[in-house]
């Protein structure tokens, strides 16, 4: 899977890299043959559940793991056999590994000092790095005198002061509380944009990936299921796994009734109507799976007019979420469809459990899934 034109040199290029671990019980494939390109200056995220191969991929880029097959290129230079300290990349971990006995300034200056840069150059670089991460004025503090977010920024400054071609981040926000984590997401994106450095960010948190990334590779079982922008990944998931892992998604499966141009009409009861724009051809009588996001569905006491998709259902659960109310509705094509209704004070319909209700949405808000087996959605993707 490549995503760059021939005249471009990607910041990081992975060419058919794989990683196989051997043991007495047999081989374990952590990463299957993987080819992708990260553009220079891009904020690129590897997103997926535990055990999907994202951290192994990052460690192969860093040089901490040797790929079983394939090549790794950094700005056109093959670094597959180059040791980590000579790859011109730096890595930031969830455990920031700051030196507790050194001040902020001394922690950040550690790398340039090891490179034996001139004293004035060290002073200039450290000053620029501290200004970039908004730590000017805290140079003399030690790590135990800093908050978790400040410690994280010290780790970033220490990595960026060496001016790497790429910065690799392995779930660096995982140890922070929710509010601080959300604030640091915006900070990380600002720092990346101002530094102009390629970021490769590993996370299992879909919110982090959607908030910060220019592009996301969604990984599952050692493979990339989908590569795209946050909007593409969320609005047009390619597989049931991606649909289930990114946000909350409803998967609808039903036999094909007929095709009208590029639109499939699914087999439902006479009063119901489900239309799905086709991405790939479907043979007559085949089952089609499609996804529609909960916020795209509307509720009504009566079937809507026109060509809107519509299903009759029974409300099973009503959950107040603050900004929205979640309705779980049983229908003929899905045991449960989730609907989000915004609590903006304009709703004239407030269904209760047991009520019969119509659900409707625009056909263009449904998206055909390539793999029809909806059971591919993992349990850990549940909201």
Curated annotation (Swiss-Prot):
Q: Which PANTHER family match?
A: SPERMIDINE/PUTRESCINE IMPORT ATP-BINDING PROTEIN POTA (PTHR42781), SPERMIDINE_PUTRESCINE IMPORT ATP-BINDING PROTEIN POTA (PTHR42781:SF4)
Q: Where is the ABC transporter domain?
A: 12-246
The way it spans or sits in the membrane comes to: Peripheral membrane protein
What's the protein name?
A: Spermidine/putrescine import ATP-binding protein PotA
**Can you state which reaction this protein catalyses?**
ATP + H2O + polyamine-[polyamine-binding protein]Side 1 = ADP + phosphate + polyamineSide 2 + [polyamine-binding protein]Side 1
What NCBIfam families does this protein map onto? potA
* NAD in keyword set: no
What does this gene product do?
Part of the ABC transporter complex PotABCD involved in spermidine/putrescine import. Responsible for energy coupling to the transport system.
Q: How does it assemble?
A: The complex is composed of two ATP-binding proteins (PotA), two transmembrane proteins (PotB and PotC) and a solute-binding protein (PotD).
In terms of superkingdom, the source organism counts as Bacteria
Compartment(s) of residence:
Cell membrane
MF terms from GO for this chain are: ABC-type putrescine transporter activity; ATP binding; ATP hydrolysis activity
Q: Name one GO cellular component term.
A: ATP-binding cassette (ABC) transporter complex
Under InterPro entries, the record lists: AAA+_ATPase, ABC_SmlMolc_Importer, ABC_transporter-like_ATP-bd, ABC_transporter-like_CS, Mo/tungstate-bd_C_term_dom, P-loop_NTPase, PotA-like, PotA_ATP-bd
User: What gene is behind this protein?
Assistant: potA
Organism in which the protein naturally occurs? Acidothermus cellulolyticus (strain ATCC 43068 / DSM 8971 / 11B)
Principal EC category:
translocase
Q: Does the keyword Lipid metabolism apply?
A: no
